[in-house]
Design a protein with these regions (language model features):
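Membrane-embedded alpha-helical bundles of multi-pass transporters/translocases
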Residues: 2-464
Length: 464
């Protein structure tokens, strides 16, 4: 992969490398968007399981995830193969993702209730703690292994999330109708899961072979070439000593709980707005502004002179949008809810496109302060935050539904349940976006790195 030099910056990637990389999140969201948006609905309204028990099982499952995130991140850093460090993990782990995705939506009705809970727990844990972890960390870390150009990293992130949100939009828009067209019931959900798994497997394979990792000597050019050896415990210490890593993890967790609450919108549409087809309309209001923002994120980074200002301004706008959704929701105005939902999504979108570049800066911060390369391990925050946050979010949804007196397979819900749906869909997302805005105000890792580089330069000049 030969680099070009343009405007004093070396370029490592062609346009099709960036697009090919981005398509990998189509495969990732075939798993994640489908699972997070519809598994609770499938389990409660089709299989007939208790949402509170489901939430508890999901929460217990997440106990395995923290260890597996750091484990696979460390394994990626230590991997040497013809495909590179990350691509082998991304390629082969997706086979397991496809199989276990289908298993989550293929719970046999011949099993007893306890066995059905056990089936779900095993399938869900294998998918999240093992296969999706390995695939997702490898995929995220490719941003570091394929280019050293910060603008290209932002562009890769933008393409990634264009595909992610396009896929999420499509799945949220067509799945209910797809299940209905497939005949409804358990068999229909299984058919839909098989179709999505096959599509994901094909696209993931294409993505892996559309991009190449830079040779190790190229990645280490200008840096200390000493062979670095560290175990899982030391890797964990390096991660948790980096305050920006902790901030990114917290942001990811809040984001995923936020997304889980919005994914429960299917219940809000069915029982509050009395029209389940509005779920796809709200998906468009969320995802179309995000896709538009992704296209202009690299330009916005240049215009606003850095990631920090853009991300903070975006989340201030996003929080204001969620406040508007609350007012519109209690007014009962669907058009206003859609408008403010779009404003919120537009404001939060730039972070989705540039977070890969921020994580790369976070990894650089560890190198500048600890003189250790932990690029693959650093990207565990993406998988860790996604799965822990998503797990907490789905579990919380199950617990809140159960506590509210939700009646399975009933067209009419008690007033306590309707009030809880307002809290889940309107209030909790606003509070979470406010928390993320505060974190963003503290996450100026670019400035911290610049100061550290200047300190090192002064030290080197003094020693000379």
């Amino acid at each position: 992969m030969k680099g070009e030099v343009s405007h004093g910056r070396k370029k490592y990637l062609k346009w099709y490398n960036k697009v090919g990389y981005g398509s990998g999140d189509l495969a990732g969201n075939v798993v994640y968007a489908f699972l997070s948006s519809f598994v609770m609905l499938y389990l409660t309204n089709t299989v007939g399981l208790n949402p509170g028990i489901i939430g508890t099982l999901i929460m217990v499952s997440k106990l395995f995830d923290g260890i597996s995130d750091m484990f696979f991140g460390t394994m990626i850093d230590k991997t040497k193969s013809k495909l590179g460090k990350a691509r082998p993990w991304m390629l082969y782990a997706y086979i397991g993702c496809a199989v276990t995705l289908v298993a989550n939506f293929a719970i046999p009705d011949t099993l007893g209730t306890t066995a059905q809970y056990a089936w779900f727990f095993v399938a869900y844990t294998l998918l999240n703690a093992v296969f999706f972890t390995a695939n997702n960390i490898a995929y995220a870390s490719l941003v570091t292994f394929c280019t050293k150009n910060s603008r290209e990293r932002v562009e890769m992130g933008s393409w990634r999330f264009i595909f992610a949100f396009s896929t999420s939009l499509l799945i949220q828009s067509v799945t209910v109708q797809f299940v209905r067209a497939a005949g409804g019931g358990a068999a229909a959900w299984r058919t839909v899961a098989v179709v999505y798994a096959v599509i994901g497997l094909i696209v993931n394979t294409i993505s892996v072979f559309s991009i190449k990792e830079l040779p190790e000597e190229e990645l280490k050019a200008g840096k200390d070439h000493t062979e670095e050896k560290y175990g899982l415990v030391e890797a964990a210490k390096l991660l948790f000593s980096n305050k920006y890593y902790l901030m990114i993890c917290a942001t990811y967790i809040c984001q995923q709980i936020y997304s889980a609450m919005l994914n429960m919108g299917i219940y809000y549409m069915i029982y509050i707005l009395k029209n389940e087809d509005l779920y796809s309309v709200f998906s468009w209001a969320i995802n179309i502004p995000v896709i538009i923002a992704m296209c202009i994120t690299p330009m916005l980074v240049e215009k606003m002179k850095g990631l920090y200002r853009m991300n903070l301004a975006g989340y201030i706008l996003g929080t204001a949008g969620r406040v508007g959704v609350i007012f519109a929701g209690y007014m009962g105005s669907v058009p206003l809810m859609l408008a403010f939902t779009a404003v919120a999504a537009l404001g939060m979108a730039p972070w989705q496109g540039d977070m890969g570049a921020v994580v790369a800066s976070c990894s650089e911060y560890t190198y500048l302060t600890k003189h250790k390369h932990i690029d693959g391990t650093m990207y565990s925050c993406t998988s860790f935050g996604t799965k822990i946050g998503g797990g907490i979010g789905v579990a919380l949804c199950g617990w809140l539904l159960d506590a509210s007196g939700f009646v399975k397979e009933s067209a009419i819900q008690p007033e306590s349940c309707l009030n809880m749906l307002h809290v889940m869909y309107l209030w909790i997302p606003m509070v979470l976006s406010l928390v993320i805005t505060f974190i963003m105000s503290r996450m100026n890792v670019e400035d911290a790195n610049e100061k550290l580089r200047k300190q090192l330069e002064r030290k080197e000049k003094y020693e000379c």
